[in-house]
């Protein structure tokens, strides 16, 4: 059914927040990569739960597809409107609704950006630990993909900081799940069902988040090793020693060289084959004790140096290279970003396999990521291939990479989500029984499949 302008105008009184067909900007028809494009009949900028509910109810009654959207930083096509219909944008729902110091919680709208939330709470002596790399992502999007980031090794992922949600189901029903209480053994955890569902089950309209006291101090350490295998083995020893690092990143020298070239910052010890970059936070005495403990462990386990980054400027430069790696690759060539996860005991094995796959296939594959949790970020680089060759070789290499990750007991994504681009590999590697349960839940909550259909786990549908 065609989208009725009048019907949407009856729900959204402000016409500036309604765009139709040819007036919809191109960036709203894609994800952050901009390499896949959808179509849409209408773009709606909602400002309230009531408006979200009204739009969903109208769409459900008329069989109109809905694509939820936040800041649009998604990398796997979750925000691409595959079947036309309505793009429901909640980016203007971006307010802090309540800060409750007694329960150490904050309630925000889904369009609030991660960087704004972090700044808001840190100015007040508080701390929101989840820290995915894209700081301009929205909190609703972080919840929808269960985003993680570098601090997951110590603090966990977004799921661990969501106390409650207000969501709107496909038929317009407003649902409130969770709350300010710490414990809950009352029935099924609907909150956890919704987290990570990539907009396929409901649209988030309010987020109740758990906060911590802001750490007293934060110090980073750069540890060079002769090779990645030695570095990763050292990480396992560090984690088992209760040194409690906040972040543990790994980078091979060939990857660091790209980041250096792009950022203009040079790493010390260019003779190293790999680097482990750690951060410690907490009380100053605790941080210093952990730094010293890890110094002994690292040097005893093959580190060729141990560089404590005491100045904020020095630490910022070192982290600038780490943060620039994806942009450094993009500056050279189109690339497909992947965030496969393996058990931490297999991180070095998996990266070694990726290097072998690169050599055998001739397709450049650049791996780095979170050594503390086994989340490997992989850039598969196009390097001038024509479209047909690129699509074929990308698919072949991805099939092999995902198969190897699953053979180690890994999964398809640690924080980006599945969306469109990872869906074929996820569907192939996931047990049919698991997919059947997921799709039964989808059909129960969205029987008409109006919400983000044919994304992630969904089979059948339209």
Annotated model-derived regions:
Residues 1-462:
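Noncatalytic alpha-helical scaffold of FAD-dependent oxidoreductases
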